[in-house]
Amino acid sequence: VTAIVEQRPVWTENPPAKEGRMYQVQVDGEIFVAPIVINAAGVYADEIHNMICEEKIRIVPRRGEYRLMDKNCGDLVNSTIFQQPSKMGKGILVTPTVHGNLLVGPTAEDIPDKQDVDTTAEGLTKVLNLGSNSVDALDGRQTITSFAGLRAHLVHEEPAEKSDFLIGEAEGHPGFIDVAGIESPGLTSAPAIG
């Protein structure tokens, strides 16, 4: 998707043909034609959506940082421990992995860069400090690796509007289907979304 966005593809709707409306996507000089376009572009779904839809959406990348602890920490808990959720997400969890390690995180930080999956000292400190609220025996020296990922946070002008899971056909554009703003629980909901 990044290459599509950086190439600024031209999206056009052809007049209805015998088989119905067709969409044309141009990428690197190649043209792809299809009656259905599924926009599942993650943090770039707003840019794809806004190329064709009059009603604009905005997605902000929300970075989540994790620590993976050594296996000698794996017996500190035997089930997933969640903290009190906030408006930013479900909070820092502590959970055992299938390999016997302990996973702690994620943070939730809205950032401007849609490709920034770097971990930060501040974020990893926050993971350890908040994770220690649930499991006080966490020791940062037992961290074997850390990583970050991005969730696609759908921003609305009206705070009362639902802020995730924009799934469906775009108004006025039959066959253009958005699957955008899938935050949490994205993995759990994937089978139902399709």
Predicted regions and their residues:
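Conserved FAD-binding catalytic core of PHBH/FMO-like flavoproteins
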Residues: 66-106
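Short, surface-exposed charged micro-motifs
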Residues: 3, 15, 33, 91-94, ...
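Glycine-centered tight beta-turn/hairpin loop motif at sheet-sheet or coil-to-beta transitions
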Residues: 27-30
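Short hydrophobic core segments
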Residues: 32-44, 194
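C-terminal catalytic lobe of FAD-dependent flavoproteins
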Residues: 89, 98-99, 110-193
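Central beta-strand plus flanking loop segment that forms part of the substrate or channel wall
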Residues: 43, 47, 51-80, 108, ...
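Short Gly/Pro-enriched turn/cap motifs at secondary-structure boundaries
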Residues: 57-59, 81-85, 93, 155-158
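A conserved short coil-to-beta-strand element within the FAD-binding core of flavoproteins
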Residues: 1-23
